[in-house]
Amino acid sequence: MFAVIKTGGKQYRVAANDLIKVEKVAGEAGDIVEFAEVLMVGSTIGAPTVAGALVTAEVVEQGRGRKVIAFKKRRRQNSKRTRGHRQELTTIRISEILTDGAKPSKKAAEKKAPKADAAEGEAAKPKKAAPKKAAAKAESAE
């Protein structure tokens, strides 16, 4: 079974275990992402999306595409400009194509709240006193 999903302003025809490069999607390697904007599943066409359809995918890697050179030259004016751009891309592997509101077998990664707790724990620790070696060197120099 295949589906057509929309992400990053583009449409992609995907099937299970497909490996595709899409515009940057939030998440790190190994995270599970969900695409709820499914335009078509098999022979079912959405208007504009298919109700209850969901595509889950695993982030394989975050990377950047090839450099695109934008070169502008104004003839007979001794004027030119070169600019380069590399688009950020995410490589994903399609895990499942779900219909009729079915639940995914793997949960999508939730927001990382433990990091905030760790930051609070570090702030609660008292600062250590300055090392005594610096004071000893200052006394010996006098």
From Swiss-Prot:
Segment forming the signal sequence: none
Keywords: Ribonucleoprotein, Ribosomal protein, RNA-binding, rRNA-binding
Region (Disordered): 74-142
Residue stretches of biased makeup (Basic and acidic residues): 107-125
A Gene Ontology BP annotation from the UniProt entry: translation
Highest taxon above the source species: Bacteria
Listed GO CC annotations: cytoplasm; ribonucleoprotein complex; ribosome
Role description: This protein binds to 23S rRNA in the presence of protein L20.
HAMAP family, alphabetized: Ribosomal_bL21 (MF_01363)
Sequence similarity: Belongs to the bacterial ribosomal protein bL21 family.
Protein name as it appears in the record: Large ribosomal subunit protein bL21
Originating species: Brucella suis (strain ATCC 23445 / NCTC 10510)
Name of the coding gene: rplU
